[in-house]
Amino acid sequence: MDTRFHCVYLLTSLDPQCEGAHYIGYTVNPIRRLRQHNGELVNGARRTKRNGRPWLLLMCVSGFGEDRIALKFEWCWQNPSKSTRLKSHVSQLRCVHKLTHAVGVLLLLLRTELFSRLQLTLHIFDREHFDKVISQLLSALPTMEPLVETSLLRVESTTIEQFQTQYMNDGQWGAAVDYGAYFMRAPPGANVDVSKPIVGGQDNTLRCGVMHNNLCEEEVIRQHVKERTLLESGHYPCSLCSLPLRAPYFLRCSRTPFCRLRAHIVCLAMWFIYDSSQRGGDPLVKDAGPAEVAENSNDAACQVNENCYSLSGCGPVVGGIFNHDAYTDRRDDNSPPSPPCPLPTQSSQADASLAATSLPLVPRAPCDCPLCDEELQWSALVYDLKRRVAVEKRRAERERREAMDAEFAQRFQRLQSESNKKSTARERGALEGVRRKRRRRGEVAAKLTQQTAVRHEPTSGASGDRAHSAPPAPSCGGFDEIPANVTNPTAPLHADVLQVTEFNVDEWLNH
C-alpha cells in the first residue's frame, strides 16, 4: 500500500522572453519541487535551469493511488502524439501551441477511459492565469468541451499556502492517527445527533491528518514499509470494524495518503447505506422520528449483518457497525452454522431476499468518508480495488515466473556441470589411452633396437684382430642393410664362413 502523495504538475514561465514555456513533471511534493525548479533547492531539472526562471506552479492533478499510474499520466501528457489514448484526438489541437496546447492535452486526457474512472482532483493555483489560457483555447477551438466537474473529477482553486496547510502539513488534529484510534460518527442505531461537531475538533471537515512536511523522505518510506508489512502479515486493522485486512482486497479513501481509511468491502458498503439512510434517501427512515430512525437503522444493520455473514462466512464484525449481540442471540439457539459463500442455505437466501427488498446491498449514491468527509464514489472505489487486485496478480505471476526461471537455471547449471564432469572424465580416459599406446610403441622399438645391437656383436672365437677391429660399415643398397620395418632381420655372412662353405671344383674332381 503506497501512502505517498502522487501528483503531476504543470509549470509555466514568468519570464517575458519565454512566454508560453511550460514544464510537465511528476512529484510527491509539488511545493518543494517548485523551489527546486527555481533554484532555491538543489536537484532541479536541467530544462528549467537553462532559461525560463522564475517558474509558476499553475496546476497539479492528484488522486493517483500509485506512482505507476501517475507516471503513466505524466508520460501521456508529455507525449500525446505517441500515446494510444490521445493520438487519435490530438489532431484537433494543431492550431494551438505551447501552454495552451498543454492545457488542451490535459482536458483530453482527463476524458479518456483510463483516467476518467479515477477519482482525481485538479488543483489550480493561479485561477486568473488558468482562465486566460482556457479562454484562448476555447476561442481557438470552439468544439472543445470546457472543463467541468463530475462525480469523479473535482476542480478546486487554491493557493500555495492553503495547499501546504491542507495537504503537506499536519492536519488540524496534530500527529497522524494511530491504528485503532479513529474519529468516527456514531454507529447505526445510536441516538446521537450527528450534526454536532465531533469530540476534539471545531468543525466537521478534516478529522485526521498525516505528517508529510515535517517528515523527511526516509521517514515517509519507513512508514510506507511499516504499513505494507502490517498488510502482508495480516495485522492492519479495518477502520470500521478493527478486524485485520487482507491485501489487496480492501477499499481505501480517494484522499490517500491524507486519509487512512482502509475498510472491508462489506463494512464500507454498510457505511454507504447508513449514510444514505441518514440523509433521508432510504424508505426505512423517511418520515420517521429520532427513535424510529434509530430503531429502523439498527434493524436494517442487523439484517444486512446476518446476510453478509451468511454470504461471506467471515464471522461477525465488531466496532459499532454490525450488531454483535443480535448475532450472538441468533447463534445460541443450536442452529447449524451458515456455510461460506457461494453455498448459502435456504434460510440465508431468505434473509438475503428480505434484506434486498428492504435495504440495497450495493451502494448507488455517493457518501462522505467517515474519517475525512471526502465524497466517495462507490464505482471509483471498486475500480481502484479491481486495478490493485489485477496489479497484485500480475506481480505474483511475475514473481512465480522469476522463481521458476531461477529454478530452471539452477537445474540447467547443475546438469551442465555434471555433463562437463563426464566429458572431462572421457577426455582424460582418451588421453590416457593415447599415452598407453605411445608407451607400448616405445617399448617395442626399444626391444627391436636391443636385438639389432646383439646380432651386430662379433663371436667370442674370432681372432684378436677381428675382435678388436671395428665392424664394417654398411654399404648403401647392399644386402647388409636392414630395413627398418623388418621384425626378424638376418645377420650378414662373414668371410670365414664363406671360405669354409665355398665349393671347390678341383677337389671334387680329384675325389
UniProtKB/Swiss-Prot annotation:
Alphabetically, which GO biological process terms does the record hold? DNA recombination; DNA repair
Q: What is this protein called?
A: Structure-specific endonuclease subunit SLX1 homolog
Please explain the role this protein plays, according to its UniProt record: Catalytic subunit of a heterodimeric structure-specific endonuclease that resolves DNA secondary structures generated during DNA repair and recombination. Has endonuclease activity towards branched DNA substrates, introducing single-strand cuts in duplex DNA close to junctions with ss-DNA.
Name where it mostly resides: nucleus
The record ties this protein, via CDD domains, to: GIY-YIG_SLX1
Q: Where are the zinc fingers (SLX1-type)?
A: 238-372
Family indicated by similarity: Belongs to the SLX1 family.
Enzyme Commission (EC) number = 3.1.-.-
Q: Domain named GIY-YIG: which ranges? A: 4-87
Q: Where in the cell is it found?
A: Nucleus
Q: Which organism is it from?
A: Trypanosoma brucei brucei (strain 927/4 GUTat10.1)
Q: Where is this region: Disordered?
A: 325-349, 417-484
Q: How does it assemble?
A: Forms a heterodimer with a member of the SLX4 family.
Kindly list the cofactors needed: a divalent metal cation
- Show the GO cellular component annotation of the record: Slx1-Slx4 complex
List compositional bias (Basic and acidic residues) regions by residue number.
419-434
Q: Name one Pfam family in it.
A: GIY-YIG
